Amino acid sequence: MTLNLYDTLSRRIVTLDCRDRVELYVCGPTVQSPPHIGHMRSGVVYDCLRRWLEYKGLPVLYVRNITDIDDKILASARSTETGETWWQIAYRVSGLFNEAYKALFVKPPDYEPLVTAHIPDIIKAIEILIQKNVAYRAMDGSGNVFFSIDKHPSYGELTDQKDLLIDDCITPGKRDPRDFTLWKEKKDTDPDLAFWESPWGPGRPGWHIECSVMATKYLGTRFAIHGGGVDLRFPHHENELAQARALGAHFADIWMHTGAVNVEGIKMSKSFGNSVLVQDALSKVSPSALRYYFLTAHYRSTLNYTENSLSQACNTWNKLQGCIYRVYDYLEREGYENDFCVSQLNTDFSTSLDNDLNIPEALAIVHNKVREMNRLVDTQADMQYLGNTLSEVVEMLSILCPIDHKITYTSGAQDNSKALLQVLLEARDRARSKGDFYTSDLLRELLAEADISVSDGHVSYGSPRG
């Protein structure tokens, strides 16, 4: 089995070393606010990677952490008007993330460790780094502990970048402005339960050490893949790697990074006020359509979110899914049982995914198959071949964008669809009679998305096309 992936560390395409299993660690969310589409795009990409590996017969041990203690979470608690504590916010928002993952068909990780459950492990790791003289207690006598970049000559190997962010550099007590925090001393403004006792006094861990510790605890000192968003490359992943190497770990063989999400050509950021929450996106399109949208750009490319591109992707997905339901219904009406099989996935499909997880290219192959199925139904061609093609398409989508099998295009479903259609048509007529042309046009557009044309009281049906 060969799977080639782009490795950020070596800056080239490398072949995954497929041992008995593939270990995958992905940096999860800091749970201070509800999930946005950038979080979910990353989650969907790594879910596709996991599904593809498992389809190829490789067991995957998948770990995705949750950062449930952080300055941002504490700031959210201070600014909230509901009186929620920081840990209540972390618990609630963690639930929102898991609901979003579930809605988008992202399989849960094997382990989802919380930072707050691993404080003793983190303290032990910091003690080892101090013993190795690559970390030190703050020079100003405070309880802060820093990692010494000067003591780790290979620092910067992941991104070829050595200068830290300005906010990190101004912390007092450092030997070198570039050194970064391993342990943060408790502040007078910190709320109750937001600190732990340590050899350096009460405080909490720095962000970067958390992932180094949890990744090696669950996956060992050497594992296959470390993933995350491109925004985490520096300083987070650079610091993670430095800490792990200083602790004696090889760490990840391959570093993967998903591209950023822009909104109307501008980087999505809270500071710009243009973050698109998952719940808002899901108010416009179905979960499967949103997942499909995330996959229309290569995982390393920037995805430019626009209302128009989301709508187009939704229409494309609805037509694709509509074709599948159409074929299911056609085969059932022709008396064919669903006993078709897939002996081997399309070679080009497999090659695309093996080539740095080229999902857009793989989706193009799915669309070609969908067009072929429509032609086979229209010409009433070989039913066995049609059924096998349908099974192959469903199999391919089970890796990329699973079909919701709770929605089936059976005869009973057709009856329900007719009843629903009648309700929509009557609602449109009522809106027109009241002069509510906005609602009337909206209902007509919704019907058009299902290939149902309404004009002057006449209704016509088209065949869904992929």
From Swiss-Prot:
The record's subcellular location field reads:
Cytoplasm
Q: Which example biological process does GO assign this protein?
A: cysteinyl-tRNA aminoacylation
CDD domains per record: CysRS_core
Q: Where is this motif: 'HIGH' region?
A: 29-39
Write out the residue ranges of the motif 'KMSKS' region.
267-271
Query: Residues that bind ATP, according to the entry?
Result: 270
Protein name in UniProt:
Cysteine--tRNA ligase 1
UniProt-recorded Gene Ontology molecular function terms: ATP binding; cysteine-tRNA ligase activity; zinc ion binding
Query: Which cofactor names does the annotation list?
Result: Zn(2+)
Q: Which residues bind Zn(2+)?
A: 27, 211, 236, 240
Q: Which UniProt keywords apply?
A: Aminoacyl-tRNA synthetase, ATP-binding, Cytoplasm, Ligase, Metal-binding, Nucleotide-binding, Protein biosynthesis, Zinc
